[in-house]
Regions:
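Well-ordered secondary-structure scaffolds
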Residues: 1-165
Length: 165
């Protein structure tokens, strides 16, 4: 599937807010508030640098939170998981809010049940698993960096053999 360029104005803003004093002091005493989950979730297969994931669900499928809905397509790619449980209402190119380009997306109608896949919240004693197993779990989870490029973390953890770190 190829992305289609569409005429759009990307939403952006200038500057932002930069408090001169300790910015955390402005909110550290504030109460935390939970946000509501969306009725419809648009999950793009390109949430990272590199090849977009390939959707592995289809219209009409019932998915659970944490379920793999997009499979990485190469080493520099990342798996995508459902952030809500519900019914897949469509899989199609949709206007990406960041890039302004139509990109493959899985659209899920939230059932409002917050049903997770089995094993999603299991933890392991990290002292008992090998570095390769940790790297494999990071890759399976689709973890990416938050530095702006959303680079797949497993790639960063796999330097060339001759590279001294």
């Amino acid at each position: 599937m190829t992305a289609t360029l569409v005429k759009s104005k990307l939403k952006t803003f200038f500057g932002g807010i930069h408090p001169k004093e300790d910015g955390k002091a402005l909110t550290s005493s504030k109460k935390e508030v939970s946000t509501l989950l969306p009725k419809i979730a648009y999950l793009f297969m390109s949430q990272h640098i590199g090849a977009p994931a390939k959707p592995n669900v289809k219209k009409g499928d019932i998915v659970k939170k944490g379920q793999l809905i997009g499979e990485a397509q190469g080493f520099v790619s990342a798996n995508i998981h459902a952030s809500v449980s519900g019914k897949v209402v469509d899989v199609l190119p949709w206007l990406h809010p960041v890039t302004g380009i139509k990109s493959p997306a899985v659209i899920i109608e939230n059932a409002g049940e917050d049903t997770w896949i089995e094993g999603a919240n299991e933890s392991s004693d990290t002292d008992q698993i090998s570095p390769d197993e940790i790297k494999q779990r990071i890759q399976s989870a689709g973890i990416v960096g938050l530095g702006g490029a959303t680079f797949p973390t497993h790639v960063k953890l796999t330097p060339p053999k001759d590279k001294v770190i």
